[in-house]
Design a protein with these regions (language model features):
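Outer-membrane beta-barrel and related beta-rich outer-membrane complex signature
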Residues: 26-30, 77-81, 156-160, 209-211
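Detector for outer-membrane/organellar transmembrane beta-barrel domains
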Residues: 95, 100-209
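Short intrinsically disordered, low-complexity coil segments enriched in acidic
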Residues: 2-7, 197, 213-214
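A short secondary-structure junction signal
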Residues: 27-28, 66-68, 76-81, 114-115, ...
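Solenoidal tandem-repeat scaffolds enriched in leucines and small polar residues
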Residues: 74-77, 81-89, 96, 104-106, ...
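Outer-membrane beta-barrel initiation region
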Residues: 66, 91-93
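Extracellular loop and loop/strand-boundary signature of outer-membrane beta-barrel proteins
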Residues: 35-40, 81-88, 120, 166-171, ...
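Outer membrane beta-barrel
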Residues: 1-74, 104-107
Length: 214
């Protein structure tokens, strides 16, 4: 990362440069060394993008919000899609990503949230709407995380759906949908013994599929 942060006040910061996109969800916030494998949306996401952001911590010490305006691309439209670019779709003149995030803490820190909404101007007439709802429940020796993620893509940025349907449709899928659930449970048996369970699922679909049974 290469960015500059300016403290506008004790609780408000402005950052610009190459930023970590504030996608939301606890899976994304974990140190990669603590993740055996990521669910598909995070695995295929471009997490470090050029742009600017502002964040604010509220006086109650329990809530914070952030807003980012980012260049949604780490490579050109041609490099991203190549020959799979649909002939009816033109690249966006301003490929921007708008990201809003809210973090909250309730019940003396027993319940925490990191919720976000992101809008991508992926191409002309093809946008992406991404929701991430991260929840954390904490007891004495037990922590439970649950993330719900929903990515509605006017043009299949991740390419998973496109690779599945490539035999019947040679271009990047339009109107692809990704819906995911991620659960992580941690139980501290003893000071040096921590049990960990991670369960996840990922559903991909092509809303433009001409086969109603497909």
């Amino acid at each position: 990362l290469a960015f500059l942060r300016i403290d506008l006040s004790k609780s408000t910061q402005l950052s610009f440069g190459k930023l970590c996109a504030d996608w939301g969800g606890f899976e994304f916030d974990f140190n990669p060394i603590d993740i055996l494998t990521y669910n598909d949306i995070i695995e295929y996401a471009d997490n470090f993008l050029v742009g600017a952001g502002v964040s604010h911590n509220f006086d109650d010490g329990k809530n914070s919000i952030s807003f980012q305006v980012l260049n949604s691309r780490t490579k050109t439209y041609e490099e991203q899609y190549g020959s799979s670019a649909p002939p009816s779709i033109n690249p966006s003149e301003f490929p921007l990503a708008l990201v809003a995030n809210w973090r909250g803490s309730f019940f003396d820190g027993k319940f925490e949230t990191t919720y976000s909404y992101s809008f991508f101007n992926e191409a002309q007439g093809a946008h992406m709407n991404y929701f991430a709802l991260g929840n954390k429940f904490k007891a004495k020796n037990f922590v439970l995380y649950y993330d719900f993620q929903y990515s509605d893509e006017g043009l299949d940025r991740k390419g998973i759906v496109s690779s599945i349907i490539s035999s019947q449709y040679p271009y990047a899928a339009q109107n692809a949908l990704y819906v995911e659930n991620w659960v992580r449970a941690e139980y501290l048996v003893a000071p040096k013994i921590n049990l960990l369970l991670t369960v996840m699922n990922s559903n991909h679909s092509w809303k433009d599929n001409p086969d109603p049974n497909g």
